[in-house]
Amino acid sequence: MSERKRELAEEASSTSFSPLKKTKLNDSSDSSPDSHDVIVFAVSSSSVASSAALASDECSVTIGGEESDQSSSISSGCFTSESKEIAKNSSSFGVDLEDHQIETETETSTFITSNFRKETSPVSEGLGETTTEMESSSATKRKQPGVRKTPTAAEIEDLFSELESQDDKKKQFIEKYNFDIVNDEPLEGRYKWDRL
């Protein structure tokens, strides 16, 4: 591992963020020219970032979202020579993730507006990939389809008798107060209704 990569790893391990998780991906071969050492920082705040060690052809992944994981955006892209220079010159690279975020030339964004959980498989860890799977909160809330109960004749009769009694109550009100509550009109009779 190069000296700069060691410095980044030491600087990352000495940070003061409360829940900080450091994971090294693709650990299998340091001597291969195609291998990439990637250090991933996961901080539970409103901004989470992972940055690649500064090699000529490596890429970075930046993940930003809310603590509640209700919405999240995932973006990735390759470093440009300018952004590598900014990162090398910055004394707090990897320490203050919110103040020194690196802009990239190519960026792909995906917005997820549901609860999700990040999972990595051994193969995807080697490739530096993280997959997201939707948590099924609706699966736990699903009700088992019940057997439809056919109402008995007595229940049907009770329903219709209630409806008839409501009609009877309306008629009684109309006769007593000479006011049609259905059409909201005064009727001729015992009382005289004046509009206010």
UniProtKB/Swiss-Prot annotation:
Primary location recorded for the protein, binned into one broad class: nucleus
Classification of source organism: Eukaryota, Viridiplantae, Streptophyta, Embryophyta, Tracheophyta
GO MF: cyclin-dependent protein serine/threonine kinase inhibitor activity; kinase binding
Superkingdom per UniProt: Eukaryota
Subunit structure: Specifically interacts with CDKA-1, but not with CDKB1-1. Interacts with CYCD1-1, CYCD4-1 and RHF1A. Binds to FBL17. Interacts with KIN10. Interacts with CYCD3-1.
Organism in which the protein naturally occurs: Arabidopsis thaliana
GO biological process, one term: negative regulation of cyclin-dependent protein serine/threonine kinase activity
Comp. bias (Low complexity): 124-139
Descriptive protein name: Cyclin-dependent kinase inhibitor 6
Expression by tissue: Expressed in newly formed organs such as the shoot apex. Expressed in cotyledon, primary root and marginal region of the leaves as well as in developing pollen.
